């Protein structure tokens, strides 16, 4: 996450119960039984609130409640027993699980001073928890009627949360009768707890605002000077990794809070009020965004659990909530920022698989964009470009002719808000310098010759067979004559390339791939054979016991011209161990492509992004392939392939994100253009996974190529993509002409294709 980022949590506020055994002098949240319609919200009422929040794009369900109301009010205990619960915390645990299951919102339990046992129960259903320290001064009049507000109880809860490794939110309430030394004491106690346990993710500095109908209604409000001073104290006393938050609805100018040192605005709800401060409505996100941008910052959504904790789930998250956090995370473990709903996805086996996915989604549908979905992405480019801080420095370095290294590439991937447009704008400048206003495409046909595979790639929804992870669907293996027929059909439709890919069939040896090449060339001698990944040729050579350079030379002589870069996935072995544990390693992929280039073959660089990896892995992938290109000049293009999650086994096993966000997709193409400048001049958008409307945005972010017309593309469709199965040049033309570009057909190796009329005249 960039240092220029200001975060907030899009949330709904769920007041589970407004009954409380404490009577604080400043509180309007707590009510008596006579003033509430029921002691607790019902499950149905809770789901109405949570569902509305999920539809509005929220990630958090903030459960706020009075402390131990059953200890004070018999009606509370009676209600709980009638509904099958013994305590408020027991009911809270059940409702957190309900919201998690039905809406996917991440519960944040703000249940007050709890003991070890109750905190542990909530840890299973709530990725983060919170409790305000408020103040450690024991003689505050404001806390005279509040047995749960003693310093001992608050500190005991803070420490118990640390012992249980709970990502924890706490804070101080200023202006309730304490003085500056009291604030310092509380902040130092919080800092000491964090130094011991490492669990404090954020500290709220909340200013007291007097409210009518409270004992402190005539008490003066906390001054802005005191608030600013307290924020500065927090920033100086707390360890730097602890985030500092202040509620923006309790001040007239939220910019003051940023100037004082906060980096988080806290929870902001588009659908519910601030039930603790109902007289102070949430500021609109556009207002907060403008405030942040006026100070060179960008506003970004986060989850209830901060990235520092979400990226180490084994320590900080219970197994029960890990996937729920992952499912709403982007690659930096921030909140996914595409507008729309993100509901939990449920699947059942498809009745008729064909060439599509083996599972179908049932139940409530998400409306946010994701790779392969039949919906429009948000408009990120073109937009007004503006960057500050590290992103601006990295962009300026590129403009000065510097080659971005791994650190600079990671920085560019951290761009948010107007920084995304700035990265895209530079990428588009470099695109124009390399390619002008021409957008290219190739007429081709995919021939997926078998879907039987002995390898166990955890992301693959395409392969079928006894050793694959997906056992439904009909395995097939095309005959040579079927392959030849498809090549001739492709030629009749104007294709210049066939793209050959398939599973690693247990009956194949290396001669099979040679035979396929000869079959294609016999059917249509001038057809370009683009086929066989590094995995296929490496495995073919291994099964023959032949050195790979020798085998590649024989493949070349049989008609192979270029290799697809697929099988690269992410060129980092820590990621490959999860995605493709029995596949070739990073070095084996790189070595294979280097040998292919030395044999006179060409290939491309692909990257499958958006599953389990992070920006540092993207950067390593780019640097490693760039270094190879410097030695061989054999790569023709860079093709980002967004992970399509819907029918992917690793997603169905709840171990992957739901693909990249649109921001990440734009950046992958733009940063790729920047990182490969001068070495790989062509950047392609995969319309199969992005749709043609998405591809149009990317043409303004560094992309110059739309790939192939792809008759018979069924690998992406097997993973659940809605796109695929062919597109026409007229479809491409409708994408490029509205943005002032010219469409041109190319060969696989980016040579111009002679127009059909000219070829016929030449005959």
Regions found by a protein language model. Give the residues of each.
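Hydrophobic faces of well-ordered beta-strands that scaffold small-molecule active sites
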Residues: 6-14, 61-63, 107-109, 129-131, ...
